[in-house]
């Protein structure tokens, strides 16, 4: 990124509508690399730092010269991008051609370019001289859409802007797709990878490191937020390597089922039954794996104190919680916590069902649903929960709007948000004070993305208050090992450990290699000093003016500080004076610390900020039937 641009914004105010300094500095780099030199870029910015806005601002700037195709994982994220594109158009202070920007979900883009599962090569010519932006780039490859991207790259020779906060999803092999899309060289990945017997033993060899450095040189933009911009994190539980883990010791009832299931499982790391029983037990496997039959049972006994009737769980076990050591710890703990909770769980066979009835029976009410037994309250409101799974994608945005609303800062509307892997995508959660992992994530990428949904810039009004993180592991009743090193156990020893502990160790092994490669990528990130790129000059000046008039309500039209600031970009007295006259005559929009939303006006020999409000009559619509006639109804 352009460090000279960063240094223009010392003491930057970021609590007003604005483009952040690091975003401007990155835009400069993207223009020089992608637009000027037709090179691809990996935008490796840690989650929560504003990759989406950077990509959309870049798309707007280059839309004057090229068509831009933006691919996102699904329709929900497409809606997020469309909404943010409107924000970007309000922020950017330059011309653009909005018709040249096309946003597609990967499924829609695939269907546009395939006929009967065969690529329509004749139609690909329309992508000549364009730029592709790929969101969640680490997830788009390894399928038909990824194959199509490779074809377009080879046929059309177009550059790609790849967005990723975690370019390695599981092992270094997943990075190979990103390398191939950014390179014209043929790469034999068997030459650069050391394959172990286990997934976590796959590592990049010395040749692989060399290939990485050569191919991605000058093609990486890395950025992470400063600690002062985020709340501190307090991990709870027992020391476990470089973190803490809560050991949730099983009751005899859960341990019996757990051991039986483990004996029956082959390749248990990928066995949904192990994930299920580490969360909660719901009777014999033949029942738990046949929920469609179980849901029609009448008063079916699962355990002496737990029954199911027409899909409804009831019985003392839902409050005693011998069926789940994790939920016993969770329910015992949340009564003493304040603020909103985000709870990640793997949506395996019966996770959502158990969660719902445990919460209801312990006094927590379902948002827009059933009221809990002896309902618990907060400030006169029910303490409520919501469960998010992939099946409810259509209503997720409405739910998150309520969860993130200022009126829910302390959980007055929704206190507990349970979510499966869908929340590892491009969503933002605000004011979350307690984060729970009911299921151990499979990868470092997944773990980071779940944390990154909440712990991000602008998600907290007060960053001085910490965020609590609870990583829960189901363990045997007599298990109390202190694990300080990955060398504490052999591979054979690891296989005898509780499933969650084994999964944690596998996660940490993969994390070690992932961090090594991320360090290499970070070192490849390019920083330089230069005057702003010509296509970004107006944008940089616009942000400087916004910052200046945040502090100043009235200045002389010949104000020395204003002149010096603008002239630092133009280095021309005549151009500087013309620019100051232009922003005044055009009534440039600013946010002032006293008058808030304002427009610039000239009053005699001064520039003043004039506050404004947009007024409208409720239920009044203006319909443009034709250019000459407007009708108000």
Swiss-Prot record:
Molecular function GO labels: ATP binding; DNA binding; helicase activity; hydrolase activity
Ranges spanned by the short sequence motif DEXH box, renumbered to the chain: 135-138
Enzyme Commission (EC) number: 3.6.4.-
Domain of life: Viruses
Residues annotated for ATP binding in this entry: 45-52
Record keywords: Activator, ATP-binding, DNA-binding, Helicase, Hydrolase, Nucleotide-binding, Transcription, Transcription regulation, Virion
Pfam families (alphabetical): Helicase_C (PF00271), ResIII (PF04851)
Compartment(s) of residence: Virion
InterPro entries cross-referenced by the UniProt entry: DNA/RNA_helicase_DEAH_CS (IPR002464), Helicase/UvrB_N (IPR006935), Helicase_ATP-bd (IPR014001), Helicase_C-like (IPR001650), P-loop_NTPase (IPR027417)
GO (cellular component) term, any one: virion component
Domain Helicase ATP-binding: start-end pairs: 32-185
Protein name: Early transcription factor 70 kDa subunit
Organism in which the protein naturally occurs: Fowlpox virus (strain NVSL) (FPV)
């Amino acid at each position: 990124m352009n460090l000279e641009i960063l240094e223009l914004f010392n003491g930057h105010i970021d609590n007003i509508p604005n483009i952040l300094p690091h975003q401007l500095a990155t835009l400069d780099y993207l223009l020089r690399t992608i637009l000027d030199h037709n090179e691809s870029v990996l935008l490796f910015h840690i989650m929560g730092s504003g990759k989406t806005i950077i990509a959309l601002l870049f798309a707007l700037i280059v839309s004057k010269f090229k068509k831009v195709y933006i691919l996102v994982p699904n329709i929900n994220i497409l809606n997020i991008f469309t909404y943010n594109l409107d924000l970007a158009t309000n922020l950017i202070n330059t011309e653009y051609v909005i018709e040249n920007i096309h946003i597609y979900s990967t499924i829609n883009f695939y269907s546009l370019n395939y006929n009967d599962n065969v690529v329509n090569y004749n139609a690909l010519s329309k992508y000549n001289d364009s730029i592709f932006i790929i969101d969640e780039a680490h997830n788009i490859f390894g399928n038909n859409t990824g194959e199509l991207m490779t074809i377009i790259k080879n046929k059309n020779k177009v550059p790609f802007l790849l967005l990723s906060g975690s370019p390695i999803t599981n092992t270094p092999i997943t990075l190979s797709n990103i390398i191939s899309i950014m390179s014209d060289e043929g790469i034999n990945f068997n030459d650069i990878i050391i394959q172990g017997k286990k997934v976590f033993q796959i590592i990049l060899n010395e040749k692989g490191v060399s290939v990485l450095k050569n191919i991605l040189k000058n093609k990486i933009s890395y950025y992470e937020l400063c600690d002062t911009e985020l709340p501190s994190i307090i991990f709870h539980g027992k020391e476990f390597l470089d973190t803490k883990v809560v050991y949730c010791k099983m009751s005899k009832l859960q341990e019996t089922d757990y051991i039986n299931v483990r004996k029956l499982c082959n390749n248990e790391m990928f066995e949904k039954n192990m994930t299920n029983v580490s969360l909660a037990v719901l009777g014999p496997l033949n029942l738990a794996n046949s929920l469609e039959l179980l849901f029609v049972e009448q008063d079916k006994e699962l355990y002496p104190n737990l029954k199911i009737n027409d899909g409804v769980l009831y019985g003392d076990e839902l409050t005693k919680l011998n069926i789940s050591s994790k939920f016993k710890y969770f329910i015992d703990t949340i009564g003493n916590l304040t603020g909103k909770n985000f709870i990640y769980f793997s949506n395996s066979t019966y996770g959502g069902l158990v969660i719902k009835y445990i919460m209801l029976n312990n006094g927590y009410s379902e948002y827009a649903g059933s009221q809990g037994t002896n309902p618990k309250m907060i400030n006169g409101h029910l303490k409520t929960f919501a469960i998010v799974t992939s099946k409810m994608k259509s209503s997720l945005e409405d739910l998150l709007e309520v969860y993130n609303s200022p009126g829910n800062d302390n959980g007055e509307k929704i206190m507990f948000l349970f979510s499966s892997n869908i929340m590892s995508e491009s969503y933002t959660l605000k004011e979350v004070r307690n984060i729970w992992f009911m299921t151990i994530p499979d990868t470092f990428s997944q773990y980071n993305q779940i944390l990154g949904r909440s712990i991000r810039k602008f998600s907290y009004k007060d960053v001085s208050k910490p965020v609590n993180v609870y990583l829960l592991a189901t363990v045997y009743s007599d298990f109390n090992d202190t694990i300080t090193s990955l060398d504490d156990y052999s591979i054979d020893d690891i296989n005898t450990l509780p499933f969650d502990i084994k999964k944690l160790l596998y996660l940490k092994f993969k994390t070690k290699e992932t961090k090594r490669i991320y360090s290499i990528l970070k070192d490849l990130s390019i920083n330089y000093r230069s005057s702003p790129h010509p296509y970004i000059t107006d944008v940089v000046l616009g942000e400087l003016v916004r910052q200046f008039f945040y502090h100043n309500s009235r200045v002389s039209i010949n104000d020395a500080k204003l002149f010096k600031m603008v002239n630092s970009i133009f280095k021309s007295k005549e151009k500087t004076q013309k620019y100051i006259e232009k922003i005044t005559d055009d009534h440039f929009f600013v946010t002032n610390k006293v008058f808030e939303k304002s427009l610039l006006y000239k009053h005699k020999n001064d520039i003043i900020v004039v506050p404004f409000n947009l007024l409208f009559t409720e239920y009044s619509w203006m319909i443009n039937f034709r250019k000459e006639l407007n009708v108000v109804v």
